[in-house]
Amino acid sequence: MTDLPFTLDQLRIFQAIVVEGSFQKAAQSLYISQPAVSLQIQNLEQQLNAPLFDRSHRKAKLTEAGQVFFKYASRILALCEETCRALEDLHHLQAGSLIIGASQTIGTYLMPGLIGLFRQKYPHICVQLQVHSTRRIAWSVAKGHIDVAVIGGAIPTELIPLLSIQPFAEDELTLIVPPDHPFARLSKIQKEDLYRLRFVSLDRHSTIRKVIDQILHQNGIDTNRLKMEMELNSIEAIKNAVQWGLGAAFVSVCAIAKELELNLVREVEIEAISIKRQLYQITNPNRYQSKAAFTFCQQMLNV
């Protein structure tokens, strides 16, 4: 058998450079020195007798040969990973790993409980939870870096043909106010009362903010008239702001169980308005699904 002109380590280094965008970042992600990365790529290019990167650009840009090589290198590494996963399954979930992805609110408040239930049954499975934006999580599933994910935002159009997308649950969003707010004593308010409130909210580009604005608009609420006093970048910051009387907010019900129990905030119902968003379980149908991933998916759908 003819010796191959590359090693798996060289493929991993090459892939890391493409994914990270530079030799330096690739070295950092692999915990090796940049000179070691450069040397491996030089040796690889010599063995292949083809330049893989255009050195005239600051960012690592692939040559035509590099683009072809990246396509096959990714497939080789994916097959190696799938081989290891398939062998792990022979242990009947007594070993192995599971990488789960989730968008911000879901990963922070919903997934820990689901993972806890799974770990009670399968304590020997190493579970990793990655929490990022919906777009980044969807791309990671498509690339095979995440086994299964739960998201609540719009999936990039170009990824839809590459993913298996299954409705998982509905996430209810509710209005909360400080416990001493006049509305806290009311069982229900009218939608016109929203114009009297001062709001703290996530950034207007966030998934939850878009869902809320869309549903309010559908119910005749002019979101441009709502008094947005402050934009924050996390649900925890929003909850704290409401507790300190800085305004009202729309948040996921799953994020405020403790605050409601301790009477730190009050939930206020809006007449004839229900704000919900669909959550989806996504996987990559073109990638080998480990027994751990399959079992976790089934558990989620049966909770």
UniProtKB/Swiss-Prot annotation:
GO cellular component terms attached to this protein's record: chloroplast
Subcellular location: Plastid, Chloroplast
Stored SUPFAM superfamilies: Periplasmic binding protein-like II, Winged helix' DNA-binding domain
UniProt entry tagged with the keyword Chloroplast: yes
Main location group: plastid
InterPro entries: LysR_subst-bd, Tscrpt_reg_HTH_LysR, WH-like_DNA-bd_sf, WH_DNA-bd_sf
UniProt entry keywords in alphabetical sequence: Chloroplast, DNA-binding, Plastid, Transcription, Transcription regulation
Gene3D superfamilies in the cross-refs: 3.40.190.290, Winged helix-like DNA-binding domain superfamily/Winged helix DNA-binding domain
Residues annotated as domain HTH lysR-type: 6-63
A Pfam family per the record: LysR_substrate
Keyword Transcription: yes
Domain of life: Eukaryota
Biological role stated in the UniProt entry: Trans-acting transcriptional regulator of RuBisCO genes (rbcL and rbcS) expression.
Annotated protein name in UniProt: Probable RuBisCO transcriptional regulator
Organism per entry: Cyanidioschyzon merolae (strain NIES-3377 / 10D)
